[in-house]
Amino acid sequence: MAPMVISDKDEMRKWSRSMRSQGKLIALVPTMGFLHEGHLSLVRDAHNHADLVAVSIYVNPGQFSPTEDLSAYPSDFQGDLQKLMSVPGGVDVVFHPHNLYDYGGDGGDAVAECGGDGVVSCVDRRSGFGHETWVRAEKLEKPLCGKSRPVFFRGVATIVTKLFNIVEPDVAVFGKKDYQQWKIIQRMVRDLDFSIKVIGSEVIREKDGLAMSSRNVYLSPEEREKAVSINKSLFRAKSAAEDGQIHCEKLINLVVQSITEAGGRIDYAEIVDQNNLEKVEWIKGPVVFCVSAWFGKARLIDNIEINL
């Protein structure tokens, strides 16, 4: 059966409060749409933790910088609904708002512009009434993806806060492929006293091991074949660590060389503490090896946890 689709914030809140008044637990799976098996696995996980599952589909302009093409982000809403219906148990509601940043008094469209501090803000082109309140995890947002995408996690933390306030879930499920994002949301929930349980779902991979991502569609067939150097080198590094090679620089060099030889362009390759995301020189406890690399127009990320 097709899920209920809600686009209005007040209607979404009303639905959630009605369900919770009946004693139902609600799990939220936030997405930007163009769903793949990785997203569907989050929905399946959500069913294990709640009575009802809500999926949000919203391409968040707040996490895009002026140099990133927001309009080019892939979308297929009807296809997304069909995929959600294929999951056992389906979903109970899809929250698909038009614009969560449109605060203009005359209904003008929100647009992304570059502020004086070099970061994106959503403002209303016509009236000047815009969004200027942001949520930030000051330390966790700076390493890894934060170096090359300085506005990204501010946008993520803010939109997730808005979704939490609108949907009012008991549980929220995030994929650990976006490891830094997952850690930031965990910290945000703790620091801001949200009464929400945050679940981290394991990375879902293609048959050849490539981490599933909506951005994989940007890869040419040749680039797609070469991109598996990311996951293959990460798994080799984990095996080397388990065999006693715990010097991080040597493991990083192994991964960088493999990806570079395959034609990739490294954004970062770092081994960090699983909790605070700080770099480590030697593996002496739980760490995560995080990689970001470009193949053609696609910027891909992946990671692997190493627990020695």
Curated annotation (Swiss-Prot):
Presence of the UniProt keyword S-adenosyl-L-methionine in the record: no
EC numbers, comma separated: 6.3.2.1
GO CC annotation, single: cytosol
Pathway field: Cofactor biosynthesis; (R)-pantothenate biosynthesis; (R)-pantothenate from (R)-pantoate and beta-alanine: step 1/1
First-tier enzyme category under EC: ligase
Propeptide: 2
Example GO biological process: pantothenate biosynthetic process
Tissue-wise expression: Expressed at low levels in leaf and root.
Reaction(s) catalysed by this chain's protein: (R)-pantoate + beta-alanine + ATP = (R)-pantothenate + AMP + diphosphate + H(+)
Disulfide bonds: none
Gene Ontology terms for molecular function: ATP binding; pantoate-beta-alanine ligase activity
pH profile of the protein: Optimum pH is 7.8. Activity decreases sharply with increasing acidity and is null at pH 7. There is only a slight decrease toward higher pH.
Record InterPro entries: Pantoate_ligase, Pantoate_ligase_C, Rossmann-like_a/b/a_fold
Domain of life according to the entry: Eukaryota
Protein keywords: ATP-binding, Cytoplasm, Ligase, Nucleotide-binding, Pantothenate biosynthesis
Subunit structure: Homodimer.
Name of the protein: Pantoate--beta-alanine ligase
The species this protein was found in: Lotus japonicus (Lotus corniculatus var. japonicus)
Gene: PANC
